[in-house]
């Protein structure tokens, strides 16, 4: 098999949550433990940092990896979902896993894993851990896929746990209250391992305190902590929500230093300033065009969209254009209720089975007082927005990671840079 055939095999043979939703979700760690034992417990050969949370965990994971890279470490980074290429999920010092490694792994191991019927994420996690061990990374930043307690990354024994925040997302699996969701994400807290909590609410803070007490784990709340100031520090990530992510990371760094990581001020400044360049991070308030301004962002739930709306309010423009698509298992009405009513809307859908048809999205949007036209795919919607916009206008593309993925996959055809 070549690389593309291998990906086709993976996408068709093992259920992928990003594509099909809940039918791909496997609760429990049984498969993960079997795979881990088969591959010789590879995660035990390198240090780890475990990152969970509803929003911001990708940005925090990439930034931590960038800082450690700049400090001279060989750093693995495991995140999800990918936007353009599967290999984005598994990186060492910013470089994606080689195509040849993915092909060899699947060819060599398929007879073992096929009878297990693993989920896509279970298998991808096994590939990542084996690759990091084979390549002898010093440390790896591991982002939780979904939840925490039963996520297949939760077999690691990290130096530090980090939980960014709690908002409503994946409620069909994690629970329908903030406290229940917090309980699932608090499941990554381990005995005696420090945990940093980025943001809390009155419903979630007691959950974290109780779990930390049960595990005798030191818990540090970023919002209550005095952090070291770095005057004039620049960050490559521009979204308003990055302010809280930055505080969370700066709270975590002294704990990593106490755990023996050698991280100096220059590494911290450089990691923040060049995170996208160092790690390949995309889709976080990312500018793709100057005239008119075109920004994309992967925010896709009420918590993430609320920050985006606040940032849109700060933009000075003649007319706001919003290209939006969503998947069918989100709080669609809750998101639409947040969006500005004076924008011109371009309703579309991503190329995934979970995508909400654009006509259904427009009907729901009309109930929220939003008006616009429908387009069959992201390139058509973005092209329409470009054609109808004035140089002093502002185009925003988002609503789903998959909308941003389709945009980035077509950026050359759309003449975006």
Label the model's feature ranges.
Residues 1-53, 60, 66-71:
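Short functional linear segments
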Residues 139-144, 152-162, 166-170, 180, ...:
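Nucleotide phosphate-binding/pyrophosphate-handling subdomain across enzymes
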Residues 78, 194-199, 322-324, 343-351:
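Short internal beta-strands
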Residues 81, 124-173, 205-234:
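Extended acidic/charged loop-beta regions that coordinate divalent cations
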Residues 200-220, 293-294, 302, 335-394:
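C-terminal helical cap/extension that packs against the catalytic core
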Residues 173-180, 185-188, 193-254:
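Internal gly/pro-rich beta-alpha loop/helix module
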Residues 22-29, 34-37, 41-44, 70-156, ...:
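ATP-dependent carboxylate-amine ligase catalytic core
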Residues 400-417:
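Glycine/aspartate-rich loop-and-adjacent alpha/beta segment that forms the canonical ThDP
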């Amino acid at each position: 098999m070549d690389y593309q055939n291998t990906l086709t095999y993976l996408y068709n043979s093992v259920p992928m949550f990003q594509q099909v939703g809940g039918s791909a979700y496997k609760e429990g760690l049984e498969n993960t433990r079997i795979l881990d034992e088969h591959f010789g417990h590879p995660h035990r050969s390198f240090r780890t940092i475990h990152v969970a949370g509803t929003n911001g965990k990708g940005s925090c994971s990439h930034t931590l990896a960038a800082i450690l890279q700049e400090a001279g470490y060989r750093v693995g980074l495991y995140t999800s979902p990918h936007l353009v290429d599967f290999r984005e999920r598994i990186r060492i010092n910013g470089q994606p896993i080689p195509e040849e490694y993915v092909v060899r792994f699947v060819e060599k191991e398929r007879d073992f894993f096929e009878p297990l019927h693993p989920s896509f994420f279970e298998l991808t996690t096994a590939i990542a851990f084996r690759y990091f061990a084979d390549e002898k990374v010093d440390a790896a930043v591991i982002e939780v896929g979904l939840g925490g307690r039963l996520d297949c990354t939760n077999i690691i024994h990290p130096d530090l746990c980090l939980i960014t925040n709690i908002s409503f997302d994946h409620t069909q699996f994690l629970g329908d209250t903030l406290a229940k969701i917090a309980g699932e994400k608090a499941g990554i807290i381990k005995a005696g391992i420090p945990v940093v909590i980025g943001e809390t609410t009155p419903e979630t803070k007691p959950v974290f305190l109780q779990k930390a007490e049960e595990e005798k784990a030191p818990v540090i709340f970023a919002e209550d902590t005095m952090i070291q100031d770095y005057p004039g520090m620049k960050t490559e990530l521009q979204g308003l929500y990055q302010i809280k992510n930055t505080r969370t990371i700066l709270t975590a760094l002294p704990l990593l230093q106490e755990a023996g990581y050698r991280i100096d001020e220059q590494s911290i400044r450089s990691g923040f300033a060049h995170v996208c360049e160092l790690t390949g991070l995309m889709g976080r308030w990312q500018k793709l065009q100057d005239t008119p301004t075109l920004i994309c962002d992967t925010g896709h739930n009420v918590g993430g969209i609320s920050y985006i709306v606040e940032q849109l309010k700060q933009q000075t423009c003649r007319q706001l254009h919003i290209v939006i698509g969503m998947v069918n298992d989100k709080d669609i009405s809750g998101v639409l209720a947040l969006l500005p009513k004076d924008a011109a809307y371009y309703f579309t859908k991503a190329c995934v089975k979970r995508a909400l048809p654009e006509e259904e999205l427009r009907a729901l949007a009309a109930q929220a007082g939003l008006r616009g036209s429908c387009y069959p795919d992201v390139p058509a919607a973005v092209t329409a927005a470009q054609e109808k916009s004035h140089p002093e206008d502002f185009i925003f593309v988002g609503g789903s990671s998959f909308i941003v993925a389709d945009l980035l996959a077509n950026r050359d055809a759309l003449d975006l840079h």
